[in-house]
C-alpha cells in the first residue's frame, strides 16, 4: 500500500475521514449509556443500562434520590447555528400551515366534483323517469334496426 506522501493518494480526504471517524467514535462513546460491566462496581445504578435479567418491577422507595431533569452540557450553540435553527423552525411552521390550507382546499374541490357527479346522475334519473328511455329514430347498430357491419 502506498504511503501517506504518495502522489496518487487523496491525502487530505483520507486524513479528514479518519479524523472525523475517530471524533465520532469518541462522541458516540460519551453519549451512549454505559453497561454495568464497563463501569465500576460502586457506580450508581441509575446511570447504567439495565441488564436483561434485572426485574422490571417498580420500587416505591429505593433510598436513591432521583436525578434532576435539567442536565448540564458542555455543547453550546454558536450564534449562527442558533439563528439557522430558528429560521428553519419558522419555515417548517409556515410549510405546515400551507399544507393544512392546501388540504382544506383540496377537500373542498373534491366535494364540489362529487356534488357535480351526484347532480348529473340525479338529473339523468329524473329525465329517465319523465321521458322514458331515449331511442334514436335511425336505429343503426341496435336490435331495432338492421345491423350493419
UniProtKB/Swiss-Prot annotation:
InterPro entries with a match to the protein in the record: Ribosome_bgen_Alb1 (IPR022784)
Chain spans, region Disordered: 1-58
One GO cellular component term: cytoplasm
Keyword Thylakoid: no
UniProt keyword list: Cytoplasm, Nucleus, Ribosome biogenesis, Transport
Biased composition (Low complexity): 30-41
Name of a matching Pfam family: Alb1
GO biological process: ribosome biogenesis
Localization, UniProt: Cytoplasm; Nucleus
Family, per entry: Belongs to the ALB1 family.
Subunit comment: Component of the nucleoplasmic and cytoplasmic pre-60S ribosomal particles.
Job description of the protein: Involved in proper assembly of pre-ribosomal particles during the biogenesis of the 60S ribosomal subunit. Accompanies the pre-60S particles to the cytoplasm.
The name this protein goes by in its record: Ribosome biogenesis protein ALB1
Species per Swiss-Prot/TrEMBL record: Lodderomyces elongisporus (strain ATCC 11503 / CBS 2605 / JCM 1781 / NBRC 1676 / NRRL YB-4239) (Yeast)
UniProt lineage: Eukaryota, Fungi, Dikarya, Ascomycota, Saccharomycotina
Amino acid at each position: 500500500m502506498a504511503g501517506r506522501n504518495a502522489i496518487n493518494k487523496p491525502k487530505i480526504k483520507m486524513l479528514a475521514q479518519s479524523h472525523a471517524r475517530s471524533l465520532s467514535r469518541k462522541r458516540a462513546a460519551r453519549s451512549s449509556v454505559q453497561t454495568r460491566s464497563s463501569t465500576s462496581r460502586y457506580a450508581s445504578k441509575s446511570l447504567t443500562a439495565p441488564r436483561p435479567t434485572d426485574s422490571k418491577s417498580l420500587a416505591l422507595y429505593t433510598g436513591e434520590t432521583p436525578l434532576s431533569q435539567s442536565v448540564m452540557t458542555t455543547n453550546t450553540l454558536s450564534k449562527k447555528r442558533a439563528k439557522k435553527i430558528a429560521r428553519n423552525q419558522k419555515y417548517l411552521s409556515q410549510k405546515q400551515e400551507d399544507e393544512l390550507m392546501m388540504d382544506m382546499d383540496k377537500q373542498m374541490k373534491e366535494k364540489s366534483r362529487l356534488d357535480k357527479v351526484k347532480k348529473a346522475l340525479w338529473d339523468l334519473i329524473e329525465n329517465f323517469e319523465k321521458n322514458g328511455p331515449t331511442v334514436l329514430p335511425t336505429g343503426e347498430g341496435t336490435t331495432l334496426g338492421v345491423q350493419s357491419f
